[in-house]
Regions:
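Short beta-strand elements
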Residues: 126-150
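Hydrophobic secretory-pathway targeting helix
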Residues: 1-22, 232
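Short beta-strand and strand-turn-strand segments in soluble, beta-rich domains
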Residues: 32-34, 74-87
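N-terminal edge beta-strand
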Residues: 22-49
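Alpha-helical transmembrane segments forming the membrane-embedded cores
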Residues: 155-250
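Intrinsically disordered, low-complexity Pro/Gly/Ser/Thr-rich segments with frequent PxxP/GP/PP motifs
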Residues: 80-108
Length: 250
């Protein structure tokens, strides 16, 4: 049941959360190795040092005090890597400032792999986000990274959920109530959707985002729910007329 609970929790975490109100008058522009963030995929190779440049355009009437530049990657509402670089500078009102720094993601290979949503943001002295820009990152990591291991764990839990539900069906041990039988199959469906989302991400086909995650997870969960609902009552037996007769020779 712990595995089923984890799969249900992962599915719930896919629901889009309310966006925090942000001041749109502060704009962040960033580029990595001369390529603008937000144009195409951002390639992150742990074996190479990247040159990051950020430009903060302050259209407000107050000074913006930047302390940290953060680059993070998330999937399924979980953060799998985050790099904070201290680059303190002030951006006067109605002006812009640019800063550059090297990024050495040497341990990135053990944290993530494949396509992931990446956010570049500038943080003030109060640890609040001033502005951010989002893109899709192509992480050249290992299958045995934290993200890869997470996907393998979800795959194992999903297999166990399906095995438990199907074995209970074969042994006529499912609940007599249709809705309870449907709920018995639901975690397996959620897990199937999560496995599909993670697999597409690792194979660098589709990055995990709400528009990609929700259809897969909801669709697979609905299919499993319907399958469980339509399973026969565990107390049902075949009609005598349907039972095969065997002739005993004397």
């Amino acid at each position: 049941m712990a595995g089923a609970g984890l799969l249900l929790w992962c599915g719930i975490m896919l629901l889009p959360s309310a966006a925090l109100a942000q001041d749109g008058s502060v704009i962040l522009e960033a580029d990595v190795d001369g390529r603008p963030v937000g144009v195409g995929n951002l390639v992150l190779d742990p074996s190479q040092t990247a040159k990051v440049s950020v430009t903060v355009r302050n259209n407000t009437t107050t000074v913006q005090r930047v302390k940290t530049v953060r680059i993070s990657g998330t999937a399924l509402a979980l953060t799998f890597f985050s790099y904070d670089t201290t680059v303190p500078f002030d951006v006067p009102a109605k002006s812009s400032e640019t800063r550059s720094f090297p990024l050495e993601p040497t341990d990135l290979g053990s944290q993530a792999i494949g396509l992931l949503p990446v956010t570049v943001e500038v943080i003030d002295v109060g640890r609040e986000s001033i502005a951010s820009v989002e893109t899709t990152g192509d992480v050249k990591g290992s299958l045995w990274s934290v993200y890869g291991a997470f996907g393998l764990g979800v795959l194992v839990l999903t297999g166990l959920s399906w095995a438990g539900a199907l074995i209970a069906l074969a042994r006529r041990r499912l609940p007599p109530n249709r809705w309870q039988r449907a709920m018995r199959f639901l975690p397996a469906g959620i897990g199937t959707g999560l496995v599909a989302v993670i697999s597409l991400s690792v194979l660098r086909l589709v990055a995990p985002s709400p528009t990609a995650e929700i259809p897969f997870v909801v669709g697979a969960a609905a299919a499993a729910f319907v399958l469980g609902y339509l399973t026969p009552h565990p107390g049902e037996r075949r009609h005598p007329s349907d039972v095969d007769t065997v002739r005993i020779q004397r």
